């Protein structure tokens, strides 16, 4: 599953690896990888594989789920497809409450006591997913956990999720993706070394000259 999804993401350009020409994230951090899972929306077979995979993760790890919640905005479409496959109610959660109307942060119904699984497109530092979890908890929901398409496997993300007492499962991850990229001849040994060094300590830019 992990390598299959990784292959899909690489093939459609949803994930780019540029260890020799790093991206700069909005945080200012240099990175050899950039992920834009929104591109999956334009590829029916890929998004269908993702929806099936997310459904499988949910059934395996969170069989008592009652509501599927998407993170705004990237998780909304995938949450909708998964909830449709599972015949479950769906809602989505904004990063913050609206400044007009009813001022909702949660759109759709997520009622007190309901068991919810959050669908996220990408786990980086875990911030947006945790914001979603906290909003649902404040509404009285029981958040069973998070499922996502991809994770960078960053220690900072793992630590934040653990601190928030939330479990998370991803369809694919950084390790599987770099392995598939190497198998496809998209990166060589020197590039793989840089990719491995970045994951160990993303904040240390020494990986750029590794």
Curated annotation (Swiss-Prot):
Keywords: Glycosyltransferase, Magnesium, Pyrimidine biosynthesis, Transferase
Signal peptide: none
EC class of the enzyme, as a word: transferase
BP GO annotations: 'de novo' UMP biosynthetic process; pyrimidine nucleobase biosynthetic process
Function statement: Catalyzes the transfer of a ribosyl phosphate group from 5-phosphoribose 1-diphosphate to orotate, leading to the formation of orotidine monophosphate (OMP).
NCBIfam families on file: pyrE (TIGR00336)
Name assigned to this protein: Orotate phosphoribosyltransferase
Gene label: pyrE
């Amino acid at each position: 599953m992990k390598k299959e999804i990784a292959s899909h993401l690489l093939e459609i350009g949803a994930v780019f690896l540029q260890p020799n020409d790093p991206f700069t994230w909005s945080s200012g951090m240099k990175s050899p990888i950039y992920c834009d899972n929104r591109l999956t929306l334009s590829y029916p077979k890929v998004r269908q594989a993702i929806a099936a995979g997310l459904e499988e993760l949910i059934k395996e790890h969170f069989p008592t789920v009652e509501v599927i919640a998407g993170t705004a905005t990237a998780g909304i479409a995938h949450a909708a497809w998964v909830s449709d496959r599972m015949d479950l109610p769906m809602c989505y959660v904004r990063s913050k409450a609206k400044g007009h109307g009813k001022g909702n942060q949660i759109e759709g119904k997520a009622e007190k006591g309901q068991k919810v699984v959050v669908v996220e497109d990408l786990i980086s530092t875990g911030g947006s997913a945790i914001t979603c979890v906290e909003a649902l908890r404040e509404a009285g929901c029981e958040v069973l956990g998070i499922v996502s398409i991809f994770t960078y496997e960053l220690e900072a993300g793992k630590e934040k999720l653990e601190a928030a007492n939330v479990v998370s499962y991803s369809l694919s991850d950084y390790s599987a993706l770099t392995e598939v990229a190497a198998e496809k001849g998209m990166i060589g040994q020197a590039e793989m070394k840089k990719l491995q060094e970045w994951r160990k300590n993303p904040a240390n830019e020494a990986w750029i000259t590794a």
